[in-house]
Regions:
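C-terminal hydrophobic helical "lid"/dimerization subdomain
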Residues: 61, 346-349, 391-442
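Helix-to-beta-strand junctions that scaffold the AdoMet/dcAdoMet cofactor pocket
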Residues: 352-353
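NAD(P)H dinucleotide-binding glycine-rich loop of Rossmann-like/cofactor-binding domains
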Residues: 160-247, 293-304
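Adenosine-nucleotide cofactor-binding segment
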Residues: 241-243, 262-343
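Hydrophobic/small residue at the entry helix of a nucleotide-binding pocket
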Residues: 251-252, 343
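Rossmann-fold dehydrogenase core element
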Residues: 289-291, 356-361, 371-409
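Glycine-rich beta-strand-centered segment in the early N-terminal region that forms part
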Residues: 89-106, 117-166, 180-183
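Conserved "cap/hinge" positions at secondary-structure junctions
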Residues: 144, 160-161, 249, 271, ...
């Protein structure tokens, strides 16, 4: 294992009376691109991107793409569709590379983009047209003189940290809300060097798996590192030799539970279809069928006002908590991974053990949650929130994945370039697996 991988391996994140979690030196991060957005003329120095000056000096690249158009400013958001057309962008700068997207993975944020919820990303970026798609594998073409992370001919994953803060953590996501970024749904694109992590030469795994890995499993890596480190600050390995880790959610949750399993935890995931329960079990994770408590969907506006709803919800919550007690021998859950949000948050907190951690990097079904701070303080519950990762975490995750086979089982069907609209329809209708992939170039 490389030094970087060792530094970031979740089992290396230890907290004792004499030492805290490992720190990442700032020098590990590509500079200065990681701390600025594309086309950001407000940042001085080598990372500066001056739109006017650049457009006069650069030649434009024209490519075929599936393009998202801006909605009408000031109007209510209306769902739209992508348009297949020619898209144009400037030649790569000195810290950028021209790339050919090969395989992409459909992500939830792509659905949010065409639904224009919670934002119209075109209007938010101040751009009439945007190319989305922020998970996948590319072939690296011409590289700028200052690029050090990849070389021409490399196969690399897209690392979708589009604009980072001073410590390298993302503020905006590439091919979503990061200004000027051009995503995977184009025959050619331009990536900054800190959006590219080269794959191991002669990798044992398919490009489809790496495409599915690039966003979800790196998200899982960063979230698990902090959640597990937080738990170990509360309870060391003598106090709690085998933590009980549960998860709501899909692919990211499954990836995170894979890390928990590798760290020696007892792992459980909740899902609601036969095929997904089978996939979970095949990964060595205990599956729990959510259909046993199908009415576990908390709605504060209906609770205690709608008698039938309240009765059904209360019964479902009771069934769920009984299931947790049975599987954990009454000890409850030490880390609960919750990528669902408001509908299950009440039940999640009730299932959490003392000194427990509830952790998330998403908000699939509700961004606003309520809790009683006094109760959480007394129980010493810790709430972890992360958003994707910083570059050195991505590098470590790739190294660990290659060494230990920690990659997702990508869907068997690969959508073709002409089938992109069908992919979006199938995804929105729930007719895909957790890792639907599509091909852009051969």
């Amino acid at each position: 294992m490389s030094a970087a991988a060792g530094r970031y391996h979740p089992l290396f994140l230890r907290a004792t009376a004499n030492s805290g979690p490992s720190r990442v030196p700032a020098r590990d991060l590509p500079r200065p691109v990681e701390t600025v957005s594309f086309l950001d003329s407000s940042v001085p120095g080598p990372g500066r991107r001056d739109k006017t000056r650049r457009s006069r000096q650069s030649m434009a690249v024209k490519t075929e793409a599936w393009v998202l158009h801006a909605g009408e400013k000031g109007s209510s958001p209306v769902s739209t569709e992508l348009v297949r057309e020619t898209f144009e962008f400037d030649d790569p700068g000195p810290q950028e590379a021209l790339v050919e997207p090969l395989i992409g993975c459909m992500e939830g944020n792509m659905g949010h983009a065409i639904e224009r919820r919670p934002i119209d990303i075109c209007l938010a970026r101040g751009e009439d047209r945007v190319v989305i798609g922020n998970a996948g594998v590319v072939r690296v073409g011409k590289v700028g003189d200052e690029v050090s992370t990849v070389k021409e001919g490399d196969t690399a994953i897209l690392f979708c940290n589009g604009k980072a803060d001073a410590h390298g953590y993302p503020e905006r996501i590439f091919a979503y809300d990061a200004e000027g970024s051009v995503g995977m749904l184009a025959k050619q694109s331009r990536f900054g060097q800190s959006q590219l992590i080269p794959l191991p030469s002669n990798t044992k795994y398919s490009l489809e798996q790496w495409a599915a890995f690039s966003l979800r499993y790196i998200t899982a890596w960063s979230n698990w590192e902090l959640a597990y480190g937080t738990l170990r600050l509360l309870l060391n390995e003598t106090d709690l030799p085998r933590p009980r880790v549960w998860g709501w959610g899909g692919g990211v949750t499954m990836g995170e539970l894979g890390l928990a399993k590798h760290a020696g935890c007892d792992v459980t995931q909740v899902a609601s279809t036969d095929d997904r329960l089978a996939m979970i079990e095949a990964q060595g994770i205990r599956p729990v069928d959510r259909r046993e408590f199908k009415d576990l969907y908390f709605d504060k506006s209906r609770f205690r006002k709608d008698e039938d709803y309240t009765k059904a919800y209360t019964a479902a919550e009771k069934t769920f908590l009984a299931k947790v007690r049975d599987i954990t021998d009454g000890n409850m859950v030490n880390i609960f991974i919750d990528f669902v949000g408001a509908p299950v948050f009440r039940a999640t907190l009730k299932a959490l053990a003392r000194e427990g951690v509830v952790t998330t990097a998403g908000w699939k079904e509700g961004m606003m949650i309520e809790l009683v701070r006094a109760s959480e303080c007394i129980a010493r519950h810790q709430h972890v929130h992360t958003h994707y990762a910083r570059y050195s975490q991505g590098v470590a995750a790739v190294a660990f994945a290659e060494e230990h086979g920690w990659l997702p089982p990508a869907d068997e069907h690969v959508y073709g370039w002409d089938e992109v609209p069908a992919l979006f329809k199938d995804y929105n209708a729930g007719n895909t697996g957790w890792f639907p992939v599509y091909r852009i170039n051969d």
